[in-house]
Curated annotation (Swiss-Prot):
Its EC number is 5.3.1.6. It comes from the Bacteria. Keywords: Isomerase. GO terms for molecular function: ribose-5-phosphate isomerase activity. This is Ribose-5-phosphate isomerase A. It comes from Aliivibrio fischeri (strain ATCC 700601 / ES114). NCBIfam families: PRK00702.1, rpiA. The keyword Isomerase applies. The gene is rpiA. InterPro entries: NagB/RpiA_transferase-like (IPR037171), Ribose5P_isomerase_typA_subgr (IPR020672), Ribose5P_isomerase_type_A (IPR004788).
Length: 218
């Protein structure tokens, strides 16, 4: 199986967690795009979706799936999203696609988080993939200096503005052994909107597309 075929297998496997009559939380990225294709086969059985990005919203609407505003729902049964890295505790680095804040919000209102990845995303220690931090523009330099104090090497993601109008710092060179503690420390910095560590709200179920098929961890 190619990497894209493994992503597709994981995306379609997540369909079993979608219940008829529900509103589904939908994440962002190449693996999620396969899930959206799968979800379209159930579009007449579900009420619709809450999306974590403009890109996913556009794809959902193109396929005829109604998209609800996050503020108009009290909660979601399930949220399906990918990850840039995930460890054995189902803690993740997310935000390579710059949608981390909205992803974290949709995850927070969902009862169950289904993470879908190919097997290249599984790691023992988080941090080889640069850790994204969404920052209010005027705080960029200050936050970068503070991230250096925390042991990171931050780089401004030039030319990228988030759906919320903010900028991204990608933090290189970190071996994250205590993800919850680092999530707290970075989120406490003035000017940080959120960090792409999903440790306090990790995945409940992990579906991994692998050469031998889809593996499930929960």
């Amino acid at each position: 199986m190619t990497q894209d075929e493994m992503k597709k297998a994981a995306g379609w496997a997540a369909l079993e967690y979608v219940e008829a009559g529900s509103i589904v939380g939908v994440g962002t990225g190449s693996t999620v795009n396969h899930f959206i294709d799968a979800l379209a086969t159930m579009k007449n059985e579900i009420k619709g979706a809450v999306s974590s990005s403009v890109a996913s919203t556009e794809k959902l609407k193109e396929l005829g799936i109604e998209v609800f505003d996050c503020n108009d729902v009290a909660g979601l049964d399930v949220y399906v999203d990918g990850a840039d890295e995930i460890n054995g505790k189902n803690e993740m680095i997310k935000g390579g696609g710059a949608a981390l804040t909205r992803e974290k919000i949709v995850a927070a209102i969902s009862d169950k988080f289904i993470c879908i990845v190919d097997d290249t995303k599984q790691v023992d220690v988080l941090g080889q993939f640069p850790l994204p931090v969404e920052v209010i523009p005027m705080a960029r330099s200050y936050v970068a200096r503070e991230l250096v104090k925390l042991g990171g090497d931050p780089a401004y993601r030039e030319g990228v503005i988030t759906d919320n109008g903010n900028v991204i710092l990608d933090v290189h060179g970190m071996k994250i052994t205590d993800a919850k503690d680092l999530e707290d420390k970075i989120n406490a910095l003035p000017g940080v909107v959120t960090v792409g560590l999903f440790a306090h709200r990790g995945a409940d179920v992990l579906l991994v597309g692998a050469p031998e098929g889809v593996k499930k961890f929960d």
